[in-house]
C-alpha cells in the first residue's frame, strides 16, 4: 500500500468550468494516490470561457486546503507533461458508457507513446453523472440555475462572465 501512496496521478482536462463532478473525482482519487495533479490543459480544440490562467486560479482556490492536490497549467502532449512531473498515472473520470470509446482510444495512444504510464479510470459519483462543463456553460448562458453543479466561487465567476441574469436562476 505504501507504493500506491507514493504514486502521482495526473488528472488532465480543460476544466472550463471546473464542476462538482471534477471536484468529487479529485478528492476521491486523492484518497487512493499520494498526490493528484489537476493538469489544466492550455492547448485545446475547444474555445474556452476562461483563460488558462483563470482556470488554474479557479482550481487552485477549490483545492487550496488539500495538500495532496496540486494544480498546474500545461500545454503540449499529455504524456510529456506526465513524465516531466515524474508521475506514472493518468487519471480519467467515466460518466457513462458513451465516454468509454474516446477515453479508451486516448488511453491506448498514451500507452503507445509511453508504456510506463498507466491510465486509471474512476467512475463518476452517481450524483454528478448528468453534469459536464459544456452543459453547465449552456445552462448558465441561457439564464439557468447552476447552483449545486459547480463550486460557489465558480458560479460567481460565471455570473461575472455571462451577466447577473445568467447562472443564478434569477433570470430564468
Curated annotation (Swiss-Prot):
Keyword hit for Transferase: yes
Cofactor: Mg(2+)
Magnesium found in the keyword field: yes
Localization, UniProt: Cytoplasm
Taxonomic superkingdom: Bacteria
Principal location class: cytoplasm
Alphabetical list of InterPro entries matching this protein: Cyt_trans-like, PPAT, Rossmann-like_a/b/a_fold
GO cellular component: cytoplasm
GO MF term set: ATP binding; pantetheine-phosphate adenylyltransferase activity
Catalytic activity: (R)-4'-phosphopantetheine + ATP + H(+) = 3'-dephospho-CoA + diphosphate
Pathway(s): Cofactor biosynthesis; coenzyme A biosynthesis; CoA from (R)-pantothenate: step 4/5
Annotated positions binding substrate: 14, 46, 78, 92
UniProt cross-references to CDD domains, sorted A to Z: PPAT
Residues the record lists as binding ATP: 14-15, 22, 93-95, 103, 128-134
GO biological process, one term: coenzyme A biosynthetic process
Record site: Transition state stabilizer: 22
A Pfam family annotated for this UniProt entry: CTP_transf_like
Summary of the function given for this chain in its UniProt record: Reversibly transfers an adenylyl group from ATP to 4'-phosphopantetheine, yielding dephospho-CoA (dPCoA) and pyrophosphate.
Family the UniProt entry places it in: Belongs to the bacterial CoaD family.
Oligomer and partners: Homohexamer.
Protein name stated in the entry: Phosphopantetheine adenylyltransferase
Native species: Solidesulfovibrio magneticus (strain ATCC 700980 / DSM 13731 / RS-1) (Desulfovibrio magneticus)
Amino acid at each position: 500500500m505504501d507504493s500506491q501512496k507514493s504514486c502521482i496521478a495526473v488528472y488532465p482536462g480543460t476544466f472550463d468550468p471546473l464542476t462538482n463532478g471534477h471536484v468529487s473525482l479529485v478528492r476521491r482519487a486523492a484518497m487512493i494516490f499520494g498526490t493528484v495533479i489537476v493538469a489544466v490543459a492550455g492547448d485545446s480544440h475547444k474555445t474556452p470561457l476562461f483563460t488558462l490562467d483563470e482556470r488554474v486560479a479557479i482550481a487552485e482556490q477549490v483545492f487550496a486546503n488539500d495538500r495532496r492536490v496540486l494544480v498546474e497549467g500545461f500545454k503540449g502532449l499529455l504524456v510529456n507533461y506526465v513524465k516531466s512531473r515524474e508521475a506514472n498515472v493518468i487519471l480519467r473520470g467515466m460518466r457513462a458508457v458513451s465516454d468509454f470509446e474516446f477515453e479508451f482510444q486516448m488511453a491506448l495512444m498514451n500507452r503507445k507513446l509511453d508504456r510506463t504510464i498507466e491510465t486509471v479510470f474512476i467512475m463518476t459519483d452517481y450524483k454528478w453523472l448528468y453534469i459536464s462543463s459544456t452543459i453547465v456553460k449552456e445552462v448558465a448562458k441561457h439564464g439557468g440555475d447552476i447552483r449545486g453543479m459547480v463550486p460557489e466561487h465558480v458560479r460567481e465567476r460565471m455570473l461575472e462572465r455571462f451577466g447577473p441574469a445568467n447562472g443564478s436562476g434569477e433570470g430564468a
